[in-house]
């Protein structure tokens, strides 16, 4: 929320502000809670990346975890500054990331191997160029939701073809986190005037970041399990510190 407090970054130039008082804790951080709430996303992506590298999963999963980290860092920059350029560093990686998910989901059954990655790369590059010059506003949200919806049929197909109970539980956590996170985001956007009058702001957008951090981790872990099944790597779900699920594989000696 805009206010009259002076800041290091100057006037707000982003097209979106969340329901949090600007520069309440520091003249260097516009939205404090919305900034620090991206830390779980970075840590979870780092854990996933280490697991993918240690067990030599396909490079696509390492890139996916790295894209999660880039998105979280871009979001931190955006909410810390509320500048239009930093807003693009948040929104453009969101689209790139979902395009990467589309590749991982659909590529196993795609007969023309070079066609899909080429198209998705050109699409992502074109979007980045256009987005650098145009402020889409609601158009960006609609575009992003459409891309997300295109992933649902394949995610559901993987779910119904997975018999492992632990893997299915991860998929259910994926659905639960995105639903709860979306409710937090919606309330923060729609009921901000009412929330601002409460004694304590629940920081709905910050909660959205936290839930989506776990959502991305669950999605990545579930997809790693499904891909390992396709490759015959005998995947099993294990738990880091007894809480955080990850995929343990046993590759045949020939691989």
Swiss-Prot record:
InterPro entries (UniProt xref): ACER (IPR008901), ACER_plant (IPR044219)
Tissue specificity remark: Mostly expressed in roots, shoot meristems and pollen, and, to a lower extent, in mature leaves.
Family named by the database record: Belongs to the alkaline ceramidase family.
Effect of loss of the gene: Pleiotropic phenotypes, including reduction of leaf size, dwarfing, small flowers and an irregular wax layer. The abnormal wax layer is associated with higher water loss and rapid chlorophyll leaching due to an increased cuticle permeability. Increased phytoceramides levels and decreased long chain bases. Increased sensitivity to salt stress. Increased susceptibility to the pathogenic bacteria P.syringae with reduced pathogenesis-related (PR) genes induction. Reduced sensitivity to abscisic acid (ABA) leading to impaired stomatal closure regulation.
Gene Ontology BP, a term: response to nutrient levels
GO CC, alphabetical: endoplasmic reticulum; endoplasmic reticulum membrane; Golgi apparatus; Golgi membrane; nucleus
Gene name per UniProt: ACER
Residue ranges that the UniProt entry lists as topological domain Lumenal: 1-28, 82-91, 193-205
Localization per record: Endoplasmic reticulum membrane; Golgi apparatus membrane
Keyword line: Abscisic acid signaling pathway, Developmental protein, Endoplasmic reticulum, Golgi apparatus, Hydrolase, Membrane, Metal-binding, Plant defense, Stress response, Transmembrane, Transmembrane helix, Zinc
Function: Hydrolyzes only phytoceramide into phytosphingosine and free fatty acid. Does not have reverse activity. Affects plant morphogenesis. Required for the formation of wax layer that ensure cuticle permeability. Implicated in abscisic acid (ABA)-mediated stomatal closure. Involved in both biotic and abiotic stresses. Promotes salt resistance and defenses responses toward pathogenic bacteria (e.g. P.syringae) and against the fungal toxin fumonisin B1 (FB1).
Protein name: Alkaline ceramidase
EC number(s) per entry: 3.5.1.-
Co-factor requirement: Zn(2+)
A Pfam family reported for this protein in Swiss-Prot or TrEMBL: Ceramidase
Domain of life: Eukaryota
Binding annotation for Zn(2+): 79, 205, 209
């Amino acid at each position: 929320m805009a206010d009259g407090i002076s800041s290091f970054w100057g006037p707000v130039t982003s097209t979106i502000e969340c329901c949090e008082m600007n520069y309440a804790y520091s003249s260097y951080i516009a939205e404090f809670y919305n900034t620090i709430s991206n830390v779980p996303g970075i840590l979870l992506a780092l854990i996933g990346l280490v697991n993918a590298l240690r067990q030599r999963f396909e490079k696509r999963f390492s890139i996916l975890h790295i894209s999660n980290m880039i998105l979280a860092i871009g979001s931190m920059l955006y909410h810390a500054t509320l500048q239009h350029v930093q807003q693009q560093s948040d929104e453009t990686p969101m689209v790139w990331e979902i395009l990467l998910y589309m590749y991982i989901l659909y590529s196993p059954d795609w007969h023309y191997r070079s066609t899909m990655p080429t198209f998705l790369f050109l699409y992502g590059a074109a979007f980045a160029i256009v987005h650098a010059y145009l402020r889409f506003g609601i158009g960006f949200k609609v575009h992003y939701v459409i891309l997300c919806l295109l992933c649902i049929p394949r995610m559901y197909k993987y779910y119904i073809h997975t018999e492992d109970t632990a893997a299915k539980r991860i998929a259910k956590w994926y659905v639960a986190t995105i639903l709860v996170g979306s409710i937090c985001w919606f309330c923060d956007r729609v009921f901000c005037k009412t929330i601002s009058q409460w004694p304590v702001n629940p920081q709905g957008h910050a909660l959205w970041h936290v839930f989506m951090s776990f959502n991305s981790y669950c999605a990545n872990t579930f997809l790693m399990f499904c891909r390992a099944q396709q490759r015959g790597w005998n995947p099993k779900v294990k738990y880091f510190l007894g809480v955080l699920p990850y995929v343990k594989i046993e590759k045949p000696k020939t691989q």
